[in-house]
Amino acid sequence: MMVSSPPQLEINLETDAEFVARHIGITPSDLPKMLSLLGYGSLKELINAVIPPEIRLQRPLALSEGLSETAALQKLRTLAQQNQVWRSYIGMGYYNCITPSVIQRNILENPGWYTQYTPYQAEIAQGRLEALLNFQTLVSDLTGLAIANASLLDEATAAAEAMTLSFNACRQRGANRFLVAQDCHPQTLAVLRTRALPLGIQIVPIDPIAGELPWENAFGLLLQYPASDGAVRSPQALIAAAHERGLLVTVATDLLALTLLRPPGELGADIAVGSSQRFGVPLGYGGPHAAFFATREDFKRQLPGRLVGVSHDALGQRALRLALQTREQHIRREKATSNICTAQVLLAVVASMYAVYHGPDGLRQIAERIHQRTVRLAAGLEAAGYQLYYSEFFDTLRIGLGNLPVPVLKERAAAARINLRYFDDGSAGISLDETTTEKDVADLLALFGARPAEVEGGDRLPAALKRQSPYLQHPVFQDYHSEHALLRYIHRLQAKDLSLTTSMIPLGSCTMKLNATAEMLPISWPEFNQLHPFAPQEQAQGYQALFRELAAMLAEITGFDAISLQPNAGSQGEYAGLLVIRQYHHSRGESQRNVCLIPTSAHGTNPASAVMAGMQVVAVNCDAQGNIDVADLAAKAETYGDRLAALMITYPSTHGVFETGICQICDIIHRYGGQVYMDGANMNAQVGLCRPGDFGADVCHLNLHKTFCIPHGGGGPGVGPIGVKAHLAPFLPTTQVIPQGSETGPVTAAPWGSASILPISWMYITLMGGVGLTRATAIAILNANYIAKRLEPYYPVLYKGAHGLVAHECILDLRPLKKSAGIEVEDIAKRLMDYGFHAPTVSWPVPGTLMIEPTESETKAELDRFCEAMIAIRSEIAEIEAGVSDRQQNPLKNAPHPALMLATEPWPYPYSREVAAYPAPWLREYKFWPAVARIDNAYGDRHLVCTCSMPLTN
């Protein structure tokens, strides 16, 4: 009997699309040399050996041919022109603002800032760490609370994180009710309801000015200050009453208002949350924007997200790094305080620079100007006989319309291309902002048949709530108010950071590929970045068309039937996908299904997300080859049987291989009634070659900031849409704009998440076309195998798949070097900085290893440079092993070597300055200098300082 051979990949990998050769770094002349090293005659032959035959896609992706950059931009411009940019005074936490041109051009549109990765390697990230420390100082000063994080995803998510922190802090009491003021932003309340349900928390809306509140069994209270509808009232008595009963109090607030109003910390709040969007970040139809989270010192170890702290380096210099990392999900896993990793660093940097540029006086002047125009608007309305709901306010009015019918007001507003907020009781809301002019005030009054009136008195702020305490006194907020000064400050910080403009960033599981300029240009178009997220949908027809087209493209690429673009980070995609699974089981009367199987190799966000979704995490073992232990999986699936909710699996695996048993694994889970959740972090190895929806996954999140070219921004923004099979489609997260009948609530504040960066992924797919995307995947796999092959004589490759090949990344085992030379993986990571490279992923998923992902965008010359650096470092280690170099005083243990270190006299090390700083010939042409020597992380955690307590840059 003849055994049929597995089907061979017949997909076309050749394309004439102009952009593909720009995106892919490997040239036609490079290809034969690289394949020859691997022992293959063609790219197809290599891919057939890597991809398991049972999952290979046997047809081309049904996507259009790739367009030229000019044609793609013209096509996108046609969509953008379908959006209508009206004057929006809707408020609800979203405001028009002015992005200073010096910040727009030199940060938001600058690849030196937006192509950086999360600052794990702090010695080559001092610039963005300083900008984030400025952000933390800004938030801490304005909120009056001791400690603030380096950004969260949006205001509603920050409020949900505050709820969770409060719940965990009061867990011993057994309380499960969270009181929420009914004048909070409605989108915040919606996200809170979503997050509360799986945790068994009951959301109780309350009237903050009512007499007695339902305190019984409550653990926390959320207040909005100023209120969503504009009221400014003191929360102090309510906070004190809550504290008497053991509740923690969160205040959602507005940073600009806090330049004039007493800060929440002074009023007794335990936590303050909000958005920094109006500090120079465009509306963007809802995002991305940097939220903030500030709290008392007591809760520093429960703080969600990332935290920048001050320490010192080996030379005694002040240096910055990420603090208290042991509390984060990648270490704490299911015990983590939050699942958030990527947040909104780029937007936090923009907001911090806005504050640096304007300084405390400039910010106060902006706030006073907005308030005075709101006062004049109020006076005109009152003179015309309209009743204001509140006599004290900052920038927002709620107006009783009297005899003016709402339809008439809407008609007048539409004729003037103005958006207002309309309440269910027939009143209207107007929120003014930095861009509002006197003419705008007159136009608004005209809608009501009113005219500007004389203003008696000064402001309309409560006397007891006027801010007296100083803020932003640090020199960084005083010294850079001219454009030249700020430009040089921005450039000085940028020069301290290694980005993709410097060299390859070979971080495994991070996919640091090209973020092409043509893909990035549209984020600055006003048709995309000046729409309010709650503007009527007919004003956003271009966006809606883009959403439909992008969702259809992603559905074709993944094999799923429906896509939600709402999740604004990979972590939120995971959470949303698990909520979909939970809701599906509940709809079938199987609410007991709450067990989530997760391999021990999984990224820490997986178990953290599962716990947030109300699931019990059960670990599944991996075998010696790094694959899921199928026998252990089957046994646990059987054990939990009708309690099995889901399996979370990454594919290719976090160990960098295509597991051949993936179909069997999915079948086992389905046999016991569970659903398969696939983490799409490694989708860059699948596009065009296989589709998760075809081989058994029921739901999958994608990282558009990895596979689909949204830049990492130094730690955000990210986008994590989810794809689902048809049976799960009814349970996708709903939005407030288009109710879908789903019982799964929204997971983000804005209906479409980080809408304004979705054009980046649309552009990437449109430029590449189906064949171009498939070729990119094949080249990414080729590059990873090329590096593995070149480095294997020097460092063992820990895991391999069929035919001795890896997927799109490889893991080098450095553990033997600790015994032979006393060298840790950190030493190699720091020494790579001296060679001009960012380290690969350190000690994950296996401690003592490096995981390398080169992507398809790097040239062969850059791959070779990286390999030569790694080989040279191995030679340095060999000298230690041979006793030629000292085990402590050697170039690795002392790395990195900043310029200041080289100026040391007398030179104290047993190797030359040249070996320290110029260990490779290419460094003589261009040398990237680490800003500081090796940082003492432990000191920084023991002596936690997370604000600008003294000058950082002179």
Swiss-Prot record:
<dbReference type="InterPro" id="IPR015424">
    <property type="entry name" value="PyrdxlP-dep_Trfase"/>
</dbReference>
<dbReference type="InterPro" id="IPR015421">
    <property type="entry name" value="PyrdxlP-dep_Trfase_major"/>
</dbReference>
<dbReference type="GO" id="GO:0019464">
    <property type="term" value="P:glycine decarboxylation via glycine cleavage system"/>
</dbReference>
<comment type="similarity">
    <text>Belongs to the GcvP family.</text>
</comment>
<dbReference type="Pfam" id="PF21478">
    <property type="entry name" value="GcvP2_C"/>
</dbReference>
<dbReference type="InterPro" id="IPR003437">
    <property type="entry name" value="GcvP"/>
</dbReference>
<dbReference type="GO" id="GO:0005829">
    <property type="term" value="C:cytosol"/>
</dbReference>
<comment type="subunit">
    <text>The glycine cleavage system is composed of four proteins: P, T, L and H.</text>
</comment>
<dbReference type="Pfam" id="PF02347">
    <property type="entry name" value="GDC-P"/>
</dbReference>
<comment type="function">
    <text>The glycine cleavage system catalyzes the degradation of glycine. The P protein binds the alpha-amino group of glycine through its pyridoxal phosphate cofactor; CO(2) is released and the remaining methylamine moiety is then transferred to the lipoamide cofactor of the H protein.</text>
</comment>
<protein>
    <recommendedName>
        <fullName>Glycine dehydrogenase (decarboxylating)</fullName>
        <ecNumber>1.4.4.2</ecNumber>
    </recommendedName>
</protein>
<dbReference type="GO" id="GO:0030170">
    <property type="term" value="F:pyridoxal phosphate binding"/>
</dbReference>
<keyword id="KW-0560">Oxidoreductase</keyword>
<dbReference type="InterPro" id="IPR049315">
    <property type="entry name" value="GDC-P_N"/>
</dbReference>
<keyword id="KW-0663">Pyridoxal phosphate</keyword>
<dbReference type="InterPro" id="IPR049316">
    <property type="entry name" value="GDC-P_C"/>
</dbReference>
<dbReference type="GO" id="GO:0016594">
    <property type="term" value="F:glycine binding"/>
</dbReference>
<dbReference type="InterPro" id="IPR015422">
    <property type="entry name" value="PyrdxlP-dep_Trfase_small"/>
</dbReference>
<feature type="modified residue" description="N6-(pyridoxal phosphate)lysine">
    <location>
        <position position="706"/>
    </location>
</feature>
<dbReference type="GO" id="GO:0005960">
    <property type="term" value="C:glycine cleavage complex"/>
</dbReference>
<dbReference type="GO" id="GO:0004375">
    <property type="term" value="F:glycine dehydrogenase (decarboxylating) activity"/>
</dbReference>
<dbReference type="InterPro" id="IPR020581">
    <property type="entry name" value="GDC_P"/>
</dbReference>
